[in-house]
């Protein structure tokens, strides 16, 4: 265990090195106080703390030269799970199956070859695979890295691959438009496995802010003026309009949130990828199994 490793001379030396570095000096605290370690976490803050601590534990294991038991988590059933109600599936037939969103490491995860094996295995088992690209990186020096990662994903997810080109809200007047993006992404692949219709330019940031605002307005009839995310929402939806003015007018806030949601272009992705995958869950499970043969 890491506690036993810490008691060795090599462990003590590693600990001293960690304590001297600003971004790693607090990693040892998770061994000194394991109160964060629970079987279940409830509420946003508890869940965030638990996941952050698990991430720190993996970093600590690597820093101390201990191999993390990635093979123990090869099955999705053994991974940490956040159980939430997905609002866009409310009211749908539960007999069609459940939706599990699995965030896998990138194909070229630096220094972690075990994660590449895990990633490929989980992608082969998935009913649908959503690759997330950064619009701002498409025409940069990182383009070749993006191309390699996308091809690595496409190799194991043919017929089940969809691509979200995120941060499309950062497009300026000289940037590629939506139609151009839909043509460019399939051209990055070595094989003809991705039709342009499965490429979705969009903004997850705008979608998140709009969806959260609409949820608050439906639930409470107003926006919580003192919460930081409301500042981001007002800035994104209304520009330089004063926050107090927006928060006092629920009809105006709802209209702005609705427009922001539509402008994010995420609705089409949810409809065509997530809802479609959910409605065809049984058939996709068979396709996924056949793809591994």
Give the location of each predicted region:
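Globular "head" domains of long coiled-coil molecular machines
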Residues: 1-280
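Long, non-membrane, amphipathic alpha-helices that form coiled-coils
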Residues: 276-293
């Amino acid at each position: 265990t890491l506690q036993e490793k810490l008691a060795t001379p090599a462990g003590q030396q590693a600990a001293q090195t960690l304590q001297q570095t600003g971004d790693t000096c607090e990693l040892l605290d998770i061994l000194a106080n394991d109160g964060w370690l629970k079987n279940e976490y409830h509420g946003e803050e508890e869940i965030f703390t638990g996941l952050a601590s698990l991430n720190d534990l993996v970093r600590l294991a690597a820093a101390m030269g201990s191999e993390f038991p990635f093979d123990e988590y090869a099955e999705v059933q053994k991974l940490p799970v956040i159980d939430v109600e997905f609002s866009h599936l409310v009211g749908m037939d539960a007999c069609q199956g459940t939706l599990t969103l699995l965030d896998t490491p990138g194909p070229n995860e630096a220094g972690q070859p075990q994660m590449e094996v895990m990633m490929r295995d989980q992608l082969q088992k998935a009913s649908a695979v959503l690759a997330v690209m950064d619009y701002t990186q498409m025409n940069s020096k990182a383009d070749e890295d993006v191309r390699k990662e996308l091809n690595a994903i496409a190799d194991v997810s043919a017929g089940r691959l969809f691509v979200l080109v995120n941060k499309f809200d950062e497009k300026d007047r000289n940037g590629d438009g939506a139609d151009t993006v839909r043509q460019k992404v399939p051209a990055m692949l070595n094989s003809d496995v991705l039709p342009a219709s499965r490429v979705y330019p969009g903004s997850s940031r705008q979608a998140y802010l709009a969806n959260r605002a609409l949820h608050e307005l439906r639930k409470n009839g107003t926006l919580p003026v003192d919460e930081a995310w409301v500042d981001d929402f007002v800035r994104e939806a209304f520009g330089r309009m004063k926050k107090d003015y927006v928060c006092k007018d629920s009809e105006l806030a709802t209209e702005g949130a609705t427009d922001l949601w539509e402008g994010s272009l995420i609705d089409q992705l949810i409809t065509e990828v997530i809802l479609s995958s959910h409605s065809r869950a049984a058939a996709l499970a068979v396709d996924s199994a056949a793809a591994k043969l």
